[in-house]
From Swiss-Prot:
One of its GO terms (molecular function) is proton-transporting ATP synthase activity, rotational mechanism. Keywords: ATP synthesis, Cell inner membrane, Cell membrane, CF(1), Hydrogen ion transport, Ion transport, Membrane, Transport. The keyword DNA repair does not apply. This is ATP synthase epsilon chain.
């Protein structure tokens, strides 16, 4: 049986989750990352995607996050999300609105670096929309 560790998912609006879990899969910028108890200390950035949380009872909860940071310690993990909602509460119109707003910002962008970041963000949001619509 896997050991439990404390996981907290925090957005600027509220604390979405704080409980003992067996594993958390996070959409790290460098790729999906599974965090379990006794994980090596790590800090990583988070891209838009799905955070999957598995409790000790085996219950799985999914959340949509729109970027942020994860602070991982052997005793726990805190994910500070720019924005996050339980996947069942995701308003798909809001996701489409975010994509359209990013496209508009891309049209007005002047600097190459800003354009590149926006293009990547749009790609991530579009992929996320496809993943969420499949579920």
């Amino acid at each position: 049986m896997a050991d439990n560790f404390n996981f907290e998912l925090v957005s600027p609006e509220r604390l979405l989750l704080s409980e003992m879990v067996t594993e958390v899969v996070i959409p790290a910028t460098e790729g999906e990352m599974t965090v379990m108890a006794h994980h090596a200390p790590t800090m990583t950035t988070i891209k838009p995607g799905i955070v999957s949380v598995r409790s000790g009872s085996g219950k799985k909860q999914d959340y949509v996050v729109f970027g942020g940071f994860a602070d991982i310690l052997p005793t726990g993990c805190t994910l500070l999300a720019e924005s996050a909602v339980p996947v069942e509460e995701l308003n798909k119109d809001e996701l489409t609105r975010r994509i359209e707003a990013a496209k508009k910002e891309l049209e007005d962008a002047v600097h190459h670096e800003h354009k590149s970041k926006l293009e990547h963000f749009i790609l991530e949001l579009t992929h996320l929309r496809g993943v969420v619509q499949q579920d």
